[in-house]
From Swiss-Prot:
Gene that this polypeptide is encoded by: E
Stored InterPro entries: E_protein_aCoV, E_protein_CoV
Function statement: Plays a central role in virus morphogenesis and assembly. Acts as a viroporin and self-assembles in host membranes forming pentameric protein-lipid pores that allow ion transport. Also plays a role in the induction of apoptosis.
Keyword entries, A-Z: Apoptosis, Host Golgi apparatus, Host membrane, Membrane, Transmembrane, Transmembrane helix
Spans traversing the lipid bilayer: 20-40
Side Intravirion, residues: 41-82
Intracellular or extracellular location(s): Host Golgi apparatus membrane
Native source species: Canine coronavirus (strain BGF10) (CCoV)
Name of protein: Envelope small membrane protein
Family listed: Belongs to the alphacoronaviruses E protein family.
UniProt superkingdom: Viruses
Length: 82
């Protein structure tokens, strides 16, 4: 089956359509890459938020607990004999 000659604008054997499909594929790949980079940025933001909201306060609380529970070493010169 041949394509009607009256509807043929440029006889390039499908070159224009091939170029359009390649450009469409390149645009889709670029958009996918941008979306992937934005997802990675979102993961970084969530990681930093979790660190500032959870990890740092828990570390401060643990340091306060360690300071509170610190038992000084026995020093026989300071011992009181009753």
């Amino acid at each position: 089956m041949t394509f009607p000659r009256a509807l043929t604008v440029i006889d390039d054997n499908g070159m224009v359509i091939s170029i359009i499909f390649w450009l469409l594929l390149i645009i889709i790949l670029i958009l996918f890459s941008i979306a992937l980079l934005n997802i990675i940025k979102l993961c970084m933001v969530c990681c930093n938020l979790g660190r500032t909201v959870v990890v740092i306060p828990v570390r401060h609380a643990y340091d306060a607990y360690k300071n509170f529970m610190r038992i000084n070493a026995y020093n026989h010169n300071e011992a009181l004999l009753v």
